[in-house]
Amino acid sequence: MQITILGSGVIGVTTAYYLAKLGHEVTVVDREEGPALETSFANAGQVSPGYASPWAAPGIPFKAAKWLFQKHAPLVLRPTCDPVQYSWLLQMLANCTDSRYKVNKTRMVRVAEYARDCLVDLRKETGIEYDQRMQGTLQLFREQYQLDGIGKDIEVLRQDGVPFEVLDREGCAKVEPALARVKDKFVGGLRLPHDETGDCFKFTNALAKIAEGLGVKFRFGVNIKSLLMSGGKVSGVETSEGVLTADRYVVALGSYTPALVKSLGLNAPIYPVKGYSITAPIVDEDRAPVSTVLDESYKIAITRLGDRIRVGGMAEVSGFTTDLPAARRATLDLSVTDLFPGGDLKAATFWSGLRPMTPDSTPIIGATRYDNVFINAGHGTLGWTMSCGSGKLLADLISGNKPDIRADDLGISRYE
């Protein structure tokens, strides 16, 4: 079949790769001048299935209210005049119950674990390089109450068979030696030894080249305007370079997915949650991380990417703005300087991206009520983690193959 994929982030490119492997003729369309130049460009860098947890969780409403008054809050809410923002927030609050949290986390871990396995297989098949490290990730707790409160997460990890280690200060310093100098800054950690790290931008660009070798065509610098309907199905995509037609269409536009599919009467409750990152060259190896360390207090990930440190995180609900406030940079600087002062922050680059978040934190992967339209979007903070699994899963669904994991609860139908 001829398949057009809208979006060349890590989700769009992985989907293209797996569809091409199954023999389809694939074209990827994007407004940017190359792959992974928006949300996939400078994310935190971890591939962390075990940390696949919903933002909508019990206690979050109370925490969010408290964070409103903190200088270095991990969550910032900036109200807009957009009613979609309020609708999305209300749906998110409805998912902040124990029962919904368990359902959503189980779905997320299922996709994320599968995606990690797909990434391992892809790496073996292609030899792809992207500053990857397979040395686990460490969630670091500065306060005892944080460490005491991981019971629900551990319960789900056990149920899903995800290996983990609860570490004291000495254990944390053993896996991340630079922490030995700052043991007074934390009380313990939760380590997931099977998690990985890597540069999502490098991966996406390398995979795009591999996909081109399989026949995938990329059309960059093309603005996507609308989906055209005829005879009860989509007949084409109106773009700045004319109408593009195919047998099947995949919408992988992240936060911009809802606007495109709204004309089809589809409700995709994906809203942008802005994240920030800085990337600094390493100047002191002894004070740099080995892998990824998640600073639980600030919701920030500090990751080793080759000879660089990537510091990313936080969440800002403020619409589609991509500005770079100095206060957000200050929070990133504070976290990394406190724990891993091995990077040259004066030479760091500062970036922001719009994470496409659903109210239940679970991505939308699968068919729509239109036979020839599919969605692969809404991965939130886990687009990199879930990318390979999401791409392979959707490629199988489009091709009529039985998927390797359960997929019936991942589609857009759960919102209709």
From Swiss-Prot:
Under catalytic activity, the entry for this protein gives: a D-alpha-amino acid + A + H2O = a 2-oxocarboxylate + AH2 + NH4(+)
Which E.C. number(s) belong to this protein? 1.4.99.-
Q: Which InterPro entries match?
A: DadA (IPR023080), FAD-dep_OxRdtase (IPR006076), FAD/NAD-bd_sf (IPR036188)
Q: Which GO terms describe its cellular component?
A: cytoplasm; plasma membrane
Superkingdom assignment:
Bacteria
Cofactor(s) required for function per UniProt: FAD
Q: Which residues bind FAD?
A: 3-17
SS bond partners: none
GO biological process terms on file? D-alanine catabolic process
Q: Quote the pathway field.
A: Amino-acid degradation; D-alanine degradation; NH(3) and pyruvate from D-alanine: step 1/1
What residue ranges are annotated as transmembrane?
A: none
Key words of the record: FAD, Flavoprotein, Oxidoreductase
MF-aspect GO terms: D-amino-acid dehydrogenase activity
Q: Which Gene3D superfamilies match?
A: D-Amino Acid Oxidase, subunit A, domain 2, FAD/NAD(P)-binding domain
Task: Please describe what this protein does.
Answer: Oxidative deamination of D-amino acids.
Hey, which family's this protein in?
A: Belongs to the DadA oxidoreductase family.
Q: What is this protein called?
A: D-amino acid dehydrogenase
- Please name the source species: Brucella anthropi (strain ATCC 49188 / DSM 6882 / CCUG 24695 / JCM 21032 / LMG 3331 / NBRC 15819 / NCTC 12168 / Alc 37) (Ochrobactrum anthropi)
